[in-house]
């Protein structure tokens, strides 16, 4: 999810919607989006809405308010244009009431924010930073259909809508860049990317305050997991550093099982030897092939995990794992040593068999 949100990947977004729909139904997703002030859905809420497939779309004010709810720990406040009115004649004061609605748990809000802070650090919102302040960021574009590209005589690479949203614990800023009509002109990913970041940097550096951090709720815990485990497992002491990632979880939902993919091998057992006067033949009981490099196990592993969702990916993940193992681990083999009279070990050779023959002459 972290990489998908930072890089604005569409497929994971739809996959997430599909899985949540299976659990709670599409209506609950619609209710959640509506509670954030995003409600241009018409009569039906369909998966395409998860990628911004609206009839007319939303606007920067609504998007700013929606993202502010994440920065506010899950509390949504409908936008308003003034805080108070003071009547000149009577000096009577009217203070605009602030209606706060909890639309998500503070744990959910913080975990999404933590991901988007990483996006901000990576420059999604723009090339700027505020001293001592966390800045969360989310960018995005929309594309056009082949028929629209032909009708308006614009390239298929045209991206009519460019979005850039950033928020801190204190403020939320949303920016839209584009043309109201394709007949007025068009942008592409290349021509829209830098301007939207530059405009945001110019605005944000004049608004955001220094020294403001998002506070992690007590209901959020961190755990170091091993990438490529399905379902998710904790990293072991042998997990390579490039396959470790420290992620956030709602307390009680963090993984508890430690991955056994990377581990020490068992020792061979029942070693025997024979000597015929010139050669020594030693043999032993071969160790079992660990599941992590057993093709039969891995095929069953991926087919089983992806049986409920996206079975078409099982073969791809399986082949990726086989390729990784071939490049980084290899096959089971045995290094054979001779111990001399002084106790030193001398390497005799390597074998993938469970026996080795050595000439003693």
Question: Predicted segment positions?
Answer:
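Short strand-edge motifs at loop-to-beta-strand transitions and within beta-strands
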Residues: 354-356
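Short beta-strand segments within Ig-like beta-sandwich modules, predominantly Fibronectin type-III
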Residues: 348-352
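Pro/Thr/Ser/Gly-rich low-complexity, intrinsically disordered linker/stalk tracts
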Residues: 253-311, 315-316, 323
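A penicillin-recognizing enzyme superfamily signal
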Residues: 3, 57-251, 255-256
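Short beta-strand elements bearing conserved aromatic residues within extracellular beta-rich modules
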Residues: 334-336
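Solvent-exposed strand-loop boundary residues in beta-sheet-rich modules
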Residues: 89, 340-344
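Active-site-adjacent helix/loop patches that line small-molecule binding or acyl-intermediate pockets
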Residues: 1-72, 115-118
């Amino acid at each position: 999810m972290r990489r998908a949100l930072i890089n604005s990947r569409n497929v994971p977004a739809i996959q997430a919607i599909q899985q949540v729909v299976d659990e709670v139904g599409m209506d609950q997703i619609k209710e959640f989006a509506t509670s954030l002030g995003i409600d241009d859905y018409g009569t039906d809420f369909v998966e395409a809405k998860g990628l911004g497939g609206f009839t007319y779309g939303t606007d920067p004010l609504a998007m700013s308010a929606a993202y502010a709810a994440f920065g506010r720990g899950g509390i949504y406040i409908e936008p308003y244009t003034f805080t108070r009115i003071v009547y000149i004649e009577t000096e009577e004061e009217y203070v605009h009431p602030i209606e706060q609605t909890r639309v998500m748990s503070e744990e959910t809000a913080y975990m999404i924010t933590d991901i988007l802070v990483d996006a901000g650090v990576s420059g999604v919102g723009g090339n700027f930073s505020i001293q001592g302040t966390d800045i969360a960021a989310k960018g995005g574009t929309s594309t056009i259909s082949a028929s629209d590209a032909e009708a308006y005589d614009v390239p298929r690479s045209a991206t009519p809508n460019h979005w850039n949203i950033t928020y801190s614990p204190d403020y939320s800023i949303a920016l839209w860049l584009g043309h109201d009509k394709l007949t007025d002109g068009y942008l592409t990913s290349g021509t829209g990317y830098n301007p939207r970041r530059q405009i945001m940097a110019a605005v944000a550096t004049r608004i955001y305050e220094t020294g403001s951090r998002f506070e992690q709720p007590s209901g959020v815990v961190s755990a170091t997991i091993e990438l490529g485990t399905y379902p998710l497992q904790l990293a072991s002491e042998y997990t390579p550093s490039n396959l470790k990632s420290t992620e956030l979880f709602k307390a009680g939902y963090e993984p508890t099982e430690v991955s056994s993919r990377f581990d020490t091998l068992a020792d061979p057992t029942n070693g025997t030897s024979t000597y015929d006067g010139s050669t020594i033949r030693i043999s032993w009981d071969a160790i079992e092939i660990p599941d992590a490099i057993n093709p039969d196990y891995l095929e069953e592993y991926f087919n089983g995990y992806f049986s409920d969702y996206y079975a078409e990916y099982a073969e791809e993940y399986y082949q990726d794992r086989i390729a990784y193992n071939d490049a980084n681990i290899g096959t089971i083999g045995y290094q054979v040593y001779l111990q001399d009279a002084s106790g030193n070990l001398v390497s005799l050779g390597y074998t993938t068999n469970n026996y080795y023959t050595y000439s003693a002459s």
